[in-house]
Amino acid sequence: MIGKLMKDWAGNLKRGEVCACFVFAVLFAWAVLLPELGKFGLKQVALFSIGLSIVSASVLVAICDQIKQINRKERVAARRSSKQVRIAFLLCFAALEVSFLAVLLSNWPGFCSTDSNDIVNQVLGVSEWSTWHRYDGLANHHPIFYTFLVWVVFQATAFFGSIDLSIGIFLFLQMTVAALVLSWCISVFVRLGFGKRYILAAFAFMLFNPILANYSVTMWKDVLFSCCALFLIVRLYSLLFHGEKKHIGRTLLVACLLLTFLRSNGFMVVGATLLVLFVIEPDLRKKVAAVGAAVFCAFLVVQGPLLSIMGVQKGHFSESVGIPLQQIAATVHKGGHINEEQEEFINRVLPMEAMRDSYNPQTPNPIKFHESFDDAFLEEHKIEFLVTWASMLPSNLGIYVKAWIDETQGYWNPGYPSWLVTNSTLYEQAPRDYLGFDWDPGFLAQKLIAALPVPFSSGTLIWAVAALVFVGCVGLEKKKRARCLVCVMPLIALLATLFVAAPAVGDYSYIFAFNLALPFVLPIAGLVKAGRPKA
């Protein structure tokens, strides 16, 4: 009797698929409730999580069952002509370009943060050492490739004699690149024959997205990085699901090189994506191996001799181990178990008293940027640091787990408030409005997250993308599930790097790629299909 009820409840889903729904539901429940351990205690949180898991699993099973039934219906391919694709591309580009330009002219010369100021200072040759920057001159702390792009524009516009104009022109070019990439992505799905409703919905998401509008004219490497990630995701989709192999080697190489050099974790994102693609698609292994080898060689050349020849200082090792550094600092702050040998090593990195007083659960920056923090010692003793961190783990497991939760929960706890935008321009000056209607989408985004923190937080965005991919994959056949995984691998790898070295909790710019990818995850996961239903 019970078995029949369970079978009826599961519908078209197999046992493994039902189990997967429960696993996903349990992970979601703990993501919601784990940060509340300090308020309610383990038993109450466990009870709440059981209830939430059952409800979530039931909803997932019902949704997945419906999607699986829909996916059984055959569809007739209906690709559109090249003329229709060009028209769609031009219309999308024109609308996005005008929208972004309105934001730029209303907030001239565009938005800048502390990181942007550091980049401009390097370009102008006035970068000085500080506890925040910790470099004097050119440095790869902010990817030197992005700094180089800014430098090129500054050199080309130097005869104007205006720093603001140079910034404005650079951000105009950045927003144009963003508009081109987004319009190309829309045009791909137009070409593949997706319905007008989906195309219009995806376009509307881009056009009326306040975070995208703000970021397009903000001097952050995350904007171009996220656009490149989206380009790679959509190109992988057109390759793996629709067999579009034309120029795949070149486009894959360009996208991977840009991702590698636009952000410090880009190499890991590219490596993980190429590895999974190599394993899952035997027919593409030669091209993938060639691209991987080229990217690896370029990375070694740039990070080694090229940076040395240019006199560019490498990024500090501490930037790559933010979470382990936080866990050690939390142990010191809370009086955890530390033996004499461990204490001696920690004191060489930063005196324990200073570490105890500087610890901030939400970011390792007060530790890394302390005036007594010895970056040089840490650079020379990387292995010893990792050994010390690992040796402290067994005796301080609870503290380590809590420190990890506090530092990363912005990327997995739905509703955790995120830092979204910056509203100032260079050196914290107020931007100028040349249009007269004071349009700053960043303020709108901030008001939205203040009023509705759940749908506008980093954690919620990530879970939304994960849920769409999950429910879509349940309805796909085995081969297509693997291909879906390849397509979203840049997002998975990006998130994984934040779980190891998040610079701050819940910083939306770090996961901006998820925002851009959200409407395109629907067809990738098979939730929206090309063509029309077969009569």
Across the structure, where does each feature detected by a protein language model lie?
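Start-transfer (signal-anchor) and selected internal transmembrane alpha helices
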Residues: 1-28, 36-101, 529-535
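Transmembrane-helix motifs of polytopic, lipid-linked glycan transferases
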Residues: 54, 58, 169-193
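Membrane-proximal lumenal/periplasmic loop motifs of glycosylation machinery
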Residues: 105-113, 124-178, 218
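Short acidic/glycine- and proline-prone juxtamembrane loop motifs at membrane-interface regions
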Residues: 114, 214-224, 262
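Specific aromatic-rich, kink-prone transmembrane helix
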Residues: 124, 187, 224-242, 256, ...
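Membrane-interface anchor segments at the N-terminal boundary of transmembrane helices
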Residues: 165-169, 404-488
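Membrane-interface alpha helices of multi-pass inner-membrane proteins
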Residues: 249-263, 274-275, 294-299
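Membrane-proximal stem/loop segments at transmembrane-domain junctions that anchor or position
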Residues: 311-435
